Protein backbone atom coordinates (compact mmCIF):
# COMPACT_ATOMS: atom_id res chain seq x y z
CA UNK A 1 0.00 0.00 0.00
CA UNK A 2 1.36 3.38 -1.01
CA UNK A 3 2.39 5.23 2.20
CA UNK A 4 1.19 8.55 0.75
CA UNK A 5 -2.38 7.45 0.14
CA UNK A 6 -4.10 9.81 2.50
CA UNK A 7 -5.64 13.03 1.29
CA UNK A 8 -6.17 16.19 3.28
CA UNK A 9 -9.74 17.41 3.38
CA UNK A 10 -10.39 21.11 3.86
CA UNK A 11 -12.46 20.70 6.99
CA UNK A 12 -12.11 23.49 9.53
CA UNK A 13 -9.52 22.63 12.21
CA UNK A 14 -10.82 21.61 15.62
CA UNK A 15 -10.44 24.07 18.50
CA UNK A 16 -7.06 24.07 20.19
CA UNK A 17 -6.71 22.32 23.50
CA UNK A 18 -3.79 22.08 25.88
CA UNK A 19 -1.73 18.98 26.26
CA UNK A 20 0.76 18.35 29.01
CA UNK A 21 2.90 15.38 29.85
CA UNK A 22 6.32 14.60 31.17
CA UNK A 23 9.11 12.55 29.77
CA UNK A 24 11.44 10.40 31.84
CA UNK A 25 14.76 10.43 30.01
CA UNK A 26 16.43 7.11 29.34
CA UNK A 27 19.46 6.17 31.39
CA UNK A 28 22.95 6.44 29.98
CA UNK A 29 25.96 4.42 31.08
CA UNK A 30 28.58 7.16 30.78
CA UNK A 31 30.12 9.18 33.65
CA UNK A 32 27.96 7.42 36.23
CA UNK A 33 26.51 9.55 39.01
CA UNK A 34 23.29 8.93 40.87
CA UNK A 35 20.72 11.77 40.65
CA UNK A 36 19.49 13.35 43.86
CA UNK A 37 17.40 16.26 45.06
CA UNK A 38 20.10 18.92 44.90
CA UNK A 39 20.84 22.39 43.57
CA UNK A 40 19.38 23.32 40.19
CA UNK A 41 21.43 25.40 37.79
CA UNK A 42 21.05 27.01 34.39
CA UNK A 43 23.56 26.22 31.65
CA UNK A 44 24.18 28.14 28.45
CA UNK A 45 25.75 25.44 26.29
CA UNK A 46 27.30 27.63 23.62
CA UNK A 47 29.21 27.05 20.40
CA UNK A 48 32.17 29.21 21.44
CA UNK A 49 31.72 29.61 25.21
CA UNK A 50 29.50 28.12 27.90
CA UNK A 51 28.30 29.56 31.22
CA UNK A 52 26.65 28.39 34.44
CA UNK A 53 24.28 30.41 36.62
CA UNK A 54 22.10 29.89 39.68
CA UNK A 55 19.15 31.83 41.03
CA UNK A 56 19.61 32.44 44.75
CA UNK A 57 18.35 34.99 47.27
CA UNK A 58 16.20 36.70 44.68
CA UNK A 59 18.84 37.20 42.00
CA UNK A 60 20.91 35.33 39.45
CA UNK A 61 24.61 34.83 39.97
CA UNK A 62 27.15 33.44 37.56
CA UNK A 63 29.25 30.49 38.72
CA UNK A 64 32.97 30.68 37.93
CA UNK A 65 34.92 27.77 36.53
CA UNK A 66 37.98 26.27 38.15
CA UNK A 67 40.14 29.13 36.84
CA UNK A 68 37.84 31.79 38.24
CA UNK A 69 36.36 32.79 34.87
CA UNK A 70 32.67 32.87 34.07
CA UNK A 71 33.13 32.04 30.39
CA UNK A 72 34.29 28.49 29.73
CA UNK A 73 35.47 27.95 26.14
CA UNK A 74 33.49 25.13 24.51
CA UNK A 75 36.66 23.27 23.58
CA UNK A 76 37.75 19.71 24.43
CA UNK A 77 41.23 18.25 24.08
CA UNK A 78 43.13 15.11 25.04
CA UNK A 79 46.37 15.99 26.79
CA UNK A 80 49.73 14.37 26.21
CA UNK A 81 49.07 12.21 29.26
CA UNK A 82 45.80 10.97 27.78
CA UNK A 83 43.60 12.98 30.13
CA UNK A 84 40.67 15.12 29.01
CA UNK A 85 41.09 18.89 29.03
CA UNK A 86 38.09 21.22 28.83
CA UNK A 87 37.81 24.99 28.55
CA UNK A 88 40.70 27.43 28.57
CA UNK A 89 43.37 24.76 28.73
CA UNK A 90 41.86 22.96 25.80
CA UNK A 91 41.55 26.21 23.85
CA UNK A 92 45.27 26.79 24.19
CA UNK A 93 45.82 23.42 22.53
CA UNK A 94 43.91 24.50 19.44
CA UNK A 95 47.20 26.01 18.37
CA UNK A 96 49.68 23.64 19.95
CA UNK A 97 47.90 20.32 19.48
CA UNK A 98 45.10 20.82 16.95
CA UNK A 99 45.11 17.12 16.10
CA UNK A 100 43.98 16.35 19.66
CA UNK A 101 41.51 19.23 20.12
CA UNK A 102 37.94 19.95 19.02
CA UNK A 103 35.85 23.12 19.07
CA UNK A 104 32.55 24.40 17.61
CA UNK A 105 31.14 20.86 17.84
CA UNK A 106 27.73 22.19 18.87
CA UNK A 107 27.09 22.88 15.18
CA UNK A 108 27.11 19.12 14.59
CA UNK A 109 24.81 17.98 17.38
CA UNK A 110 22.51 15.23 16.17
CA UNK A 111 24.61 14.38 13.12
CA UNK A 112 26.93 11.46 12.42
CA UNK A 113 30.03 13.66 12.14
CA UNK A 114 32.91 12.43 14.27
CA UNK A 115 35.91 14.27 15.70
CA UNK A 116 39.28 12.55 16.00
CA UNK A 117 41.23 13.57 19.08
CA UNK A 118 44.53 11.73 19.04
CA UNK A 119 43.66 8.07 18.63
CA UNK A 120 40.11 8.47 19.97
CA UNK A 121 36.93 9.33 18.06
CA UNK A 122 33.98 11.28 19.48
CA UNK A 123 30.56 12.37 18.32
CA UNK A 124 29.41 15.94 18.98
CA UNK A 125 27.11 14.88 21.83
CA UNK A 126 29.98 13.00 23.49
CA UNK A 127 32.17 16.09 23.37
CA UNK A 128 29.27 18.13 24.73
CA UNK A 129 28.93 15.59 27.53
CA UNK A 130 32.57 16.11 28.48
CA UNK A 131 32.00 19.87 28.49
CA UNK A 132 28.82 19.54 30.57
CA UNK A 133 30.55 17.25 33.06
CA UNK A 134 33.28 19.86 33.52
CA UNK A 135 30.67 22.60 34.06
CA UNK A 136 28.82 20.38 36.54
CA UNK A 137 32.02 19.77 38.52
CA UNK A 138 32.80 23.51 38.57
CA UNK A 139 29.32 24.23 39.93
CA UNK A 140 29.64 21.55 42.60
CA UNK A 141 33.04 22.87 43.70
CA UNK A 142 31.73 26.44 43.93
CA UNK A 143 28.40 25.61 45.61
CA UNK A 144 29.76 22.91 47.90
CA UNK A 145 26.94 20.49 47.07
CA UNK A 146 25.97 17.98 44.44
CA UNK A 147 24.43 19.33 41.23
CA UNK A 148 22.36 16.80 39.31
CA UNK A 149 19.65 18.91 37.66
CA UNK A 150 19.85 21.72 35.14
CA UNK A 151 17.95 23.80 32.65
CA UNK A 152 20.03 23.73 29.46
CA UNK A 153 19.55 26.20 26.64
CA UNK A 154 19.45 25.31 22.94
CA UNK A 155 19.03 27.38 19.78
CA UNK A 156 15.36 28.02 19.12
CA UNK A 157 15.79 26.48 15.69
CA UNK A 158 17.25 23.18 16.93
CA UNK A 159 15.14 20.34 15.56
CA UNK A 160 13.97 17.26 17.46
CA UNK A 161 17.13 15.25 16.81
CA UNK A 162 19.44 18.08 17.86
CA UNK A 163 17.43 18.57 21.03
CA UNK A 164 17.56 14.87 21.81
CA UNK A 165 21.31 14.87 21.22
CA UNK A 166 21.58 17.66 23.81
CA UNK A 167 19.54 15.62 26.29
CA UNK A 168 21.74 12.61 25.60
CA UNK A 169 24.85 14.68 26.29
CA UNK A 170 23.41 15.84 29.61
CA UNK A 171 22.50 12.28 30.57
CA UNK A 172 26.05 11.16 29.75
CA UNK A 173 27.35 13.94 32.02
CA UNK A 174 25.14 12.86 34.92
CA UNK A 175 22.67 15.72 34.60
CA UNK A 176 18.91 15.41 34.64
CA UNK A 177 17.48 17.95 32.21
CA UNK A 178 14.71 19.89 33.92
CA UNK A 179 13.94 21.56 30.62
CA UNK A 180 15.52 22.48 27.31
CA UNK A 181 14.96 26.22 27.03
CA UNK A 182 15.24 28.14 23.77
CA UNK A 183 18.13 30.59 23.95
CA UNK A 184 16.28 33.76 22.92
CA UNK A 185 13.46 32.84 25.30
CA UNK A 186 15.99 32.54 28.12
CA UNK A 187 17.40 35.94 27.24
CA UNK A 188 13.89 37.38 27.20
CA UNK A 189 13.23 35.92 30.64
CA UNK A 190 16.41 37.51 32.01
CA UNK A 191 15.54 40.85 30.41
CA UNK A 192 11.96 40.75 31.65
CA UNK A 193 12.94 40.16 35.26
CA UNK A 194 15.80 42.68 35.20
CA UNK A 195 14.05 45.54 33.43
CA UNK A 196 10.42 44.69 34.28
CA UNK A 197 9.11 46.50 31.20
CA UNK A 198 5.39 47.24 31.27
CA UNK A 199 3.42 46.04 28.23
CA UNK A 200 6.51 45.89 26.05
CA UNK A 201 7.06 44.05 22.80
CA UNK A 202 10.72 43.27 22.21
CA UNK A 203 12.87 41.34 19.78
CA UNK A 204 15.73 39.11 20.91
CA UNK A 205 18.59 39.14 18.39
CA UNK A 206 20.79 36.20 19.39
CA UNK A 207 23.97 35.80 17.35
CA UNK A 208 26.40 33.40 18.96
CA UNK A 209 29.53 31.76 17.72
CA UNK A 210 27.78 29.21 15.54
CA UNK A 211 24.02 29.79 15.59
CA UNK A 212 21.59 32.64 15.03
CA UNK A 213 18.12 32.98 16.56
CA UNK A 214 15.57 35.75 16.63
CA UNK A 215 12.41 35.80 18.72
CA UNK A 216 9.60 38.30 19.18
CA UNK A 217 8.33 38.46 22.77
CA UNK A 218 5.69 40.35 24.70
CA UNK A 219 6.02 41.23 28.39
CA UNK A 220 2.84 42.11 30.28
CA UNK A 221 1.60 41.57 33.85
CA UNK A 222 4.47 39.23 34.70
CA UNK A 223 4.00 37.17 31.54
CA UNK A 224 6.83 36.60 29.04
CA UNK A 225 5.07 35.41 25.89
CA UNK A 226 6.94 34.32 22.77
CA UNK A 227 5.07 35.34 19.61
CA UNK A 228 7.43 33.98 16.95
CA UNK A 229 10.89 32.49 16.52
CA UNK A 230 13.17 31.89 13.55
CA UNK A 231 16.83 31.20 13.03
CA UNK A 232 19.76 29.61 11.24
CA UNK A 233 21.68 26.83 12.98
CA UNK A 234 24.71 27.31 10.74
CA UNK A 235 25.31 31.04 11.01
CA UNK A 236 27.32 32.80 13.69
CA UNK A 237 30.46 34.70 14.56
CA UNK A 238 32.60 31.83 13.23
CA UNK A 239 31.28 32.55 9.74
CA UNK A 240 32.59 36.12 9.89
CA UNK A 241 36.00 34.70 10.79
CA UNK A 242 35.77 32.51 7.70
CA UNK A 243 35.10 35.63 5.61
CA UNK A 244 38.32 37.15 6.94
CA UNK A 245 40.14 33.91 6.15
CA UNK A 246 39.02 34.19 2.52
CA UNK A 247 40.15 37.83 2.37
CA UNK A 248 43.55 36.87 3.79
CA UNK A 249 44.15 33.94 1.44
CA UNK A 250 43.02 36.01 -1.53
CA UNK A 251 45.78 38.53 -0.83
CA UNK A 252 48.48 35.95 -0.16
CA UNK A 253 49.04 34.91 -3.75
CA UNK A 254 52.54 33.60 -3.01
CA UNK A 255 51.18 30.65 -1.02
CA UNK A 256 51.28 27.23 -2.67
CA UNK A 257 48.23 24.97 -2.79
CA UNK A 258 49.78 22.76 -0.11
CA UNK A 259 50.38 25.75 2.16
CA UNK A 260 46.82 26.97 1.64
CA UNK A 261 45.47 23.54 2.52
CA UNK A 262 47.56 23.47 5.69
CA UNK A 263 46.40 26.96 6.66
CA UNK A 264 42.75 25.96 6.27
CA UNK A 265 43.01 24.04 9.56
CA UNK A 266 45.55 26.32 11.23
CA UNK A 267 44.57 27.38 14.74
CA UNK A 268 47.30 30.05 14.61
CA UNK A 269 45.57 31.63 11.63
CA UNK A 270 42.20 31.31 13.35
CA UNK A 271 43.47 33.21 16.39
CA UNK A 272 44.99 35.90 14.17
CA UNK A 273 41.70 36.22 12.28
CA UNK A 274 39.69 36.45 15.50
CA UNK A 275 42.00 39.22 16.72
CA UNK A 276 41.66 41.04 13.40
CA UNK A 277 37.87 40.76 13.52
CA UNK A 278 37.79 42.54 16.87
CA UNK A 279 40.37 45.11 15.79
CA UNK A 280 38.32 46.02 12.71
CA UNK A 281 35.52 46.99 15.05
CA UNK A 282 37.70 49.80 16.40
CA UNK A 283 40.10 50.63 13.57
CA UNK A 284 39.90 51.04 9.80
CA UNK A 285 42.30 48.19 9.05
CA UNK A 286 44.01 45.20 10.64
CA UNK A 287 47.14 43.23 9.80
CA UNK A 288 47.02 39.44 9.83
CA UNK A 289 50.38 37.65 10.08
CA UNK A 290 51.11 33.92 10.45
CA UNK A 291 54.13 31.65 10.32
CA UNK A 292 54.11 29.44 7.22
CA UNK A 293 57.01 27.02 6.94
CA UNK A 294 59.38 29.27 8.87
CA UNK A 295 58.49 32.52 7.08
CA UNK A 296 55.98 35.19 8.05
CA UNK A 297 53.11 35.72 5.64
CA UNK A 298 51.00 38.82 6.22
CA UNK A 299 48.15 40.81 4.72
CA UNK A 300 46.31 44.00 5.63
CA UNK A 301 42.50 43.82 5.58
CA UNK A 302 40.53 47.07 5.59
CA UNK A 303 37.20 47.49 7.31
CA UNK A 304 35.52 48.31 4.01
CA UNK A 305 36.94 45.15 2.41
CA UNK A 306 35.70 43.04 5.33
CA UNK A 307 32.24 44.63 5.35
CA UNK A 308 31.87 44.18 1.59
CA UNK A 309 32.87 40.51 1.80
CA UNK A 310 30.44 39.96 4.69
CA UNK A 311 27.36 41.17 2.77
CA UNK A 312 26.13 37.63 1.98
CA UNK A 313 26.15 36.86 5.71
CA UNK A 314 24.17 40.01 6.44
CA UNK A 315 21.59 38.87 3.90
CA UNK A 316 21.31 35.53 5.69
CA UNK A 317 20.88 37.34 9.02
CA UNK A 318 18.05 39.34 7.53
CA UNK A 319 15.96 36.35 6.44
CA UNK A 320 15.10 34.96 9.93
CA UNK A 321 14.31 38.51 11.05
CA UNK A 322 11.77 38.89 8.28
CA UNK A 323 10.25 35.48 8.95
CA UNK A 324 9.83 36.13 12.69
CA UNK A 325 8.21 39.52 12.09
CA UNK A 326 6.00 38.11 9.36
CA UNK A 327 4.84 35.20 11.54
CA UNK A 328 4.16 37.62 14.41
CA UNK A 329 2.32 39.87 11.91
CA UNK A 330 4.35 42.87 12.95
CA UNK A 331 6.11 45.72 11.19
CA UNK A 332 9.59 46.68 12.49
CA UNK A 333 8.14 49.96 13.80
CA UNK A 334 5.92 47.96 16.17
CA UNK A 335 8.91 46.58 18.09
CA UNK A 336 9.56 48.58 21.27
CA UNK A 337 13.08 47.32 21.96
CA UNK A 338 15.78 45.16 20.36
CA UNK A 339 17.82 43.09 22.82
CA UNK A 340 21.25 41.88 21.71
CA UNK A 341 22.40 38.46 22.88
CA UNK A 342 25.53 36.48 22.03
CA UNK A 343 29.14 37.58 21.80
CA UNK A 344 29.01 38.11 18.03
CA UNK A 345 26.55 40.99 18.50
CA UNK A 346 29.48 43.03 19.81
CA UNK A 347 30.72 43.47 16.25
CA UNK A 348 30.03 47.09 15.20
CA UNK A 349 28.98 45.74 11.81
CA UNK A 350 26.09 43.87 13.43
CA UNK A 351 25.00 46.80 15.59
CA UNK A 352 25.15 49.20 12.65
CA UNK A 353 23.08 46.82 10.53
CA UNK A 354 20.42 46.51 13.23
CA UNK A 355 20.31 50.28 13.69
CA UNK A 356 19.76 50.73 9.96
CA UNK A 357 17.05 48.06 9.76
CA UNK A 358 15.06 49.18 12.81
CA UNK A 359 16.02 52.88 12.77
CA UNK A 360 17.06 52.79 16.43
CA UNK A 361 19.90 51.72 18.70
CA UNK A 362 19.66 48.24 20.21
CA UNK A 363 19.28 47.72 23.96
CA UNK A 364 22.47 46.47 25.64
CA UNK A 365 21.29 46.65 29.27
CA UNK A 366 21.71 42.87 29.58
CA UNK A 367 25.25 41.57 29.07
CA UNK A 368 25.13 39.71 25.71
CA UNK A 369 27.40 36.94 27.02
CA UNK A 370 25.44 36.39 30.25
CA UNK A 371 21.77 36.86 29.41
CA UNK A 372 21.06 33.28 28.29
CA UNK A 373 22.66 31.62 31.32
CA UNK A 374 20.86 34.00 33.69
CA UNK A 375 17.54 33.26 32.02
CA UNK A 376 18.17 29.52 32.31
CA UNK A 377 18.85 29.95 36.03
CA UNK A 378 15.56 31.83 36.43
CA UNK A 379 13.72 29.01 34.64
CA UNK A 380 15.35 26.44 36.95
CA UNK A 381 14.15 28.45 39.95
CA UNK A 382 10.63 28.65 38.54
CA UNK A 383 10.55 24.88 38.05
CA UNK A 384 11.78 24.42 41.63
CA UNK A 385 9.07 26.86 42.81
CA UNK A 386 11.66 29.09 44.44
CA UNK A 387 9.70 31.65 46.46
CA UNK A 388 12.41 34.28 45.99
CA UNK A 389 11.81 34.54 42.24
CA UNK A 390 9.21 37.04 41.09
CA UNK A 391 5.98 35.49 39.87
CA UNK A 392 6.38 35.14 36.13
CA UNK A 393 4.69 33.04 33.48
CA UNK A 394 6.66 31.93 30.43
CA UNK A 395 5.04 30.73 27.22
CA UNK A 396 7.00 29.47 24.22
CA UNK A 397 6.16 28.52 20.64
CA UNK A 398 6.76 25.70 18.19
CA UNK A 399 10.00 26.35 16.26
CA UNK A 400 8.96 24.05 13.39
CA UNK A 401 5.70 22.85 11.86
CA UNK A 402 4.56 19.28 12.53
CA UNK A 403 2.44 17.30 10.09
CA UNK A 404 2.17 14.22 7.91
CA UNK A 405 2.86 13.17 4.33
CA UNK A 406 -0.20 13.16 2.07
CA UNK A 407 -1.25 13.32 -1.56
CA UNK A 408 -3.37 15.97 -3.25
CA UNK A 409 -5.75 16.01 -6.20
CA UNK A 410 -4.53 18.28 -9.01
CA UNK A 411 -7.66 17.81 -11.11
CA UNK A 412 -8.08 16.07 -14.46
CA UNK A 413 -7.51 12.73 -12.77
CA UNK A 414 -3.96 13.64 -11.70
CA UNK A 415 -2.59 13.33 -8.19
CA UNK A 416 0.63 14.62 -6.60
CA UNK A 417 2.25 12.48 -3.93
CA UNK A 418 4.72 13.21 -1.17
CA UNK A 419 3.11 16.47 -0.04
CA UNK A 420 3.65 17.86 3.46
CA UNK A 421 0.39 18.62 5.27
CA UNK A 422 0.99 20.70 8.45
CA UNK A 423 -1.22 19.94 11.45
CA UNK A 424 0.53 22.11 14.05
CA UNK A 425 2.17 25.05 12.30
CA UNK A 426 5.32 26.78 13.48
CA UNK A 427 5.13 29.52 16.10
CA UNK A 428 1.95 28.20 17.71
CA UNK A 429 2.04 28.51 21.53
CA UNK A 430 2.83 25.28 23.38
CA UNK A 431 1.38 23.15 24.84
CA UNK A 432 -0.96 22.75 21.88
CA UNK A 433 -3.33 20.19 20.39
CA UNK A 434 -4.81 20.37 16.89
CA UNK A 435 -6.76 18.04 14.64
CA UNK A 436 -7.11 17.66 10.87
CA UNK A 437 -9.26 15.29 8.80
CA UNK A 438 -7.93 13.11 5.96
CA UNK A 439 -9.59 10.58 3.67
CA UNK A 440 -8.49 7.66 1.52
CA UNK A 441 -6.99 8.47 -1.86
CA UNK A 442 -7.74 5.22 -3.68
CA UNK A 443 -10.33 2.45 -3.79
CA UNK A 444 -10.21 -0.44 -1.31
CA UNK A 445 -7.34 0.81 0.83
CA UNK A 446 -6.83 -1.42 3.86
CA UNK A 447 -4.37 0.78 5.71
CA UNK A 448 -2.97 4.30 5.88
CA UNK A 449 0.64 4.82 6.88
CA UNK A 450 1.20 8.20 8.51
CA UNK A 451 4.72 9.60 8.20
CA UNK A 452 5.10 12.13 11.02
CA UNK A 453 7.25 15.03 9.82
CA UNK A 454 8.87 18.18 11.18
CA UNK A 455 9.80 21.08 8.92
CA UNK A 456 8.55 23.72 6.51
CA UNK A 457 9.09 22.31 3.01
CA UNK A 458 6.11 21.56 0.75
CA UNK A 459 7.94 18.38 -0.30
CA UNK A 460 7.60 15.76 2.44
CA UNK A 461 10.99 14.24 1.61
CA UNK A 462 12.76 17.49 2.50
CA UNK A 463 11.41 17.52 6.06
CA UNK A 464 12.64 15.58 9.08
CA UNK A 465 10.82 12.29 9.68
CA UNK A 466 10.02 11.69 13.36
CA UNK A 467 8.41 8.29 12.90
CA UNK A 468 5.52 6.34 11.38
CA UNK A 469 2.10 5.13 12.48
CA UNK A 470 0.09 2.55 10.50
CA UNK A 471 -3.71 2.65 10.74
CA UNK A 472 -5.88 -0.27 9.59
CA UNK A 473 -9.06 0.74 7.74
CA UNK A 474 -11.96 -1.13 6.07
CA UNK A 475 -11.78 -1.38 2.25
CA UNK A 476 -14.15 1.15 0.72
CA UNK A 477 -14.35 3.34 -2.41
CA UNK A 478 -12.00 6.31 -2.58
CA UNK A 479 -12.83 9.08 -0.13
CA UNK A 480 -15.46 7.15 1.87
CA UNK A 481 -13.20 6.44 4.84
CA UNK A 482 -11.81 9.39 6.77
CA UNK A 483 -9.58 9.66 9.81
CA UNK A 484 -9.24 12.51 12.29
CA UNK A 485 -5.56 12.96 13.13
CA UNK A 486 -4.82 14.89 16.33
CA UNK A 487 -1.31 16.10 17.19
CA UNK A 488 -0.68 17.11 20.81
CA UNK A 489 2.68 18.64 21.71
CA UNK A 490 3.95 19.68 25.13
CA UNK A 491 6.68 21.95 26.43
CA UNK A 492 9.07 18.99 26.89
CA UNK A 493 8.92 18.06 23.22
CA UNK A 494 6.59 15.08 23.66
CA UNK A 495 4.37 14.53 20.61
CA UNK A 496 1.23 12.42 20.97
CA UNK A 497 -0.46 11.33 17.73
CA UNK A 498 -4.05 10.12 18.04
CA UNK A 499 -6.12 8.77 15.12
CA UNK A 500 -9.89 8.27 15.35
CA UNK A 501 -12.99 7.42 13.29
CA UNK A 502 -16.05 6.55 15.37
CA UNK A 503 -18.12 5.43 12.36
CA UNK A 504 -15.77 2.55 11.53
CA UNK A 505 -14.38 2.11 15.06
CA UNK A 506 -10.87 3.12 13.94
CA UNK A 507 -8.37 4.09 16.62
CA UNK A 508 -4.60 4.28 16.88
CA UNK A 509 -2.18 6.15 19.09
CA UNK A 510 1.56 6.62 19.31
CA UNK A 511 3.83 8.87 21.33
CA UNK A 512 7.02 10.23 19.80
CA UNK A 513 9.60 11.06 22.42
CA UNK A 514 11.73 13.93 21.13
CA UNK A 515 13.03 12.18 18.05
CA UNK A 516 12.31 9.34 15.71
CA UNK A 517 12.85 6.46 18.11
CA UNK A 518 11.61 4.00 15.52
CA UNK A 519 14.37 4.88 13.04
CA UNK A 520 17.99 3.84 12.99
CA UNK A 521 20.70 6.46 13.33
CA UNK A 522 21.54 5.98 9.65
CA UNK A 523 17.95 6.71 8.60
CA UNK A 524 17.84 9.81 10.79
CA UNK A 525 21.00 11.20 9.25
CA UNK A 526 19.80 10.41 5.76
CA UNK A 527 16.58 12.33 6.34
CA UNK A 528 18.54 15.32 7.60
CA UNK A 529 20.73 15.42 4.50
CA UNK A 530 18.07 15.03 1.85
CA UNK A 531 17.84 17.93 -0.57
CA UNK A 532 15.38 18.74 -3.26
CA UNK A 533 16.69 17.72 -6.67
CA UNK A 534 15.33 19.52 -9.71
CA UNK A 535 14.67 17.16 -12.60
CA UNK A 536 16.07 17.66 -16.09
CA UNK A 537 14.19 18.92 -19.17
CA UNK A 538 12.74 22.47 -18.82
CA UNK A 539 13.19 22.28 -15.04
CA UNK A 540 16.88 23.06 -15.36
CA UNK A 541 16.23 26.39 -17.06
CA UNK A 542 16.95 29.47 -15.00
CA UNK A 543 13.46 30.96 -15.07
CA UNK A 544 11.79 27.75 -13.96
CA UNK A 545 14.29 27.15 -11.17
CA UNK A 546 13.87 30.72 -9.98
CA UNK A 547 10.07 30.45 -9.89
CA UNK A 548 10.14 27.09 -8.10
CA UNK A 549 12.61 28.31 -5.48
CA UNK A 550 10.62 31.49 -4.97
CA UNK A 551 7.48 29.41 -4.55
CA UNK A 552 9.17 27.18 -1.98
CA UNK A 553 10.39 30.23 -0.06
CA UNK A 554 6.92 31.76 -0.01
CA UNK A 555 5.44 28.43 1.09
CA UNK A 556 7.83 28.37 4.04
CA UNK A 557 7.10 32.00 4.91
CA UNK A 558 3.31 31.72 4.94
CA UNK A 559 0.89 29.78 7.13
CA UNK A 560 -2.63 28.36 7.01
CA UNK A 561 -4.77 28.66 3.89
CA UNK A 562 -2.19 30.80 2.08
CA UNK A 563 0.42 28.09 2.53
CA UNK A 564 -1.95 25.44 1.15
CA UNK A 565 -2.78 27.58 -1.90
CA UNK A 566 0.90 28.24 -2.66
CA UNK A 567 1.79 24.57 -2.23
CA UNK A 568 -1.01 23.52 -4.59
CA UNK A 569 0.17 25.95 -7.28
CA UNK A 570 3.76 24.69 -6.93
CA UNK A 571 2.56 21.15 -7.60
CA UNK A 572 0.61 22.28 -10.68
CA UNK A 573 3.61 24.17 -12.10
CA UNK A 574 5.90 21.18 -11.54
CA UNK A 575 3.44 18.92 -13.34
CA UNK A 576 3.37 21.31 -16.34
CA UNK A 577 7.18 21.33 -16.46
CA UNK A 578 7.18 17.55 -16.62
CA UNK A 579 4.92 17.69 -19.68
CA UNK A 580 7.78 19.27 -21.71
CA UNK A 581 5.17 21.21 -23.70
CA UNK A 582 7.11 24.43 -24.34
CA UNK A 583 4.09 26.54 -25.32
CA UNK A 584 2.18 25.46 -22.22
CA UNK A 585 5.26 26.03 -20.05
CA UNK A 586 5.68 29.61 -21.33
CA UNK A 587 2.07 30.41 -20.45
CA UNK A 588 2.44 28.75 -17.06
CA UNK A 589 5.60 30.74 -16.29
CA UNK A 590 3.79 34.03 -16.74
CA UNK A 591 0.77 32.93 -14.71
CA UNK A 592 2.87 31.41 -11.91
CA UNK A 593 5.10 34.50 -11.68
CA UNK A 594 2.05 36.77 -11.40
CA UNK A 595 0.52 34.47 -8.79
CA UNK A 596 3.67 34.50 -6.65
CA UNK A 597 3.96 38.28 -6.83
CA UNK A 598 0.70 38.59 -4.89
CA UNK A 599 2.25 36.76 -1.92
CA UNK A 600 5.66 38.43 -2.01
CA UNK A 601 4.95 41.72 -0.25
CA UNK A 602 8.58 42.74 0.11
CA UNK A 603 7.75 45.48 2.64
CA UNK A 604 9.53 43.91 5.57
CA UNK A 605 12.91 45.40 6.53
Where are these regions (language model features)?
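Oxyanion-binding/catalytic loops of NTP- or PPi-dependent enzymes
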Residues: 26-111, 115-121, 130, 137-605
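Cationic, low-complexity basic patches in intrinsically disordered or flexible, solvent-exposed regions
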Residues: 8, 15, 35
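Aromatic (phenylalanine/tyrosine) cluster motif
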Residues: 4, 11, 19, 24-26, ...
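Short N-terminal leader segment in a subset of presequences, especially plant chloroplast
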Residues: 9-11, 46
Amino acid sequence: MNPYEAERKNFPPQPETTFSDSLSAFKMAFFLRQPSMTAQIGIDLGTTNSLIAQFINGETRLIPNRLGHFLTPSVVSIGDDGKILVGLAARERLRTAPQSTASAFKRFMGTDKTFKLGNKTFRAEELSALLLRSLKEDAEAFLGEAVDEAVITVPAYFNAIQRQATRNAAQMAGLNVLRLLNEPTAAGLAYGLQEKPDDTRFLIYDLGGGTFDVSVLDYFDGVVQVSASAGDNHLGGEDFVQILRQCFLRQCKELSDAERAKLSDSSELWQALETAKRKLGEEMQAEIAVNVGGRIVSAVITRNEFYEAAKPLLTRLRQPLERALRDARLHPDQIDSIILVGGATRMPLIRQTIAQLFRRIANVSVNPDEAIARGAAVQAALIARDESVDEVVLTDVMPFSLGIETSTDLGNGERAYGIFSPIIERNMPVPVSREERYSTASDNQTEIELRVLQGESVAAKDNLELGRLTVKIPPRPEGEVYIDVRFSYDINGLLDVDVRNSEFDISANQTFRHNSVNLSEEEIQASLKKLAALKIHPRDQHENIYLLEKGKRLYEEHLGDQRQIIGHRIMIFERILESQDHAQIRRAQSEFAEFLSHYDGGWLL
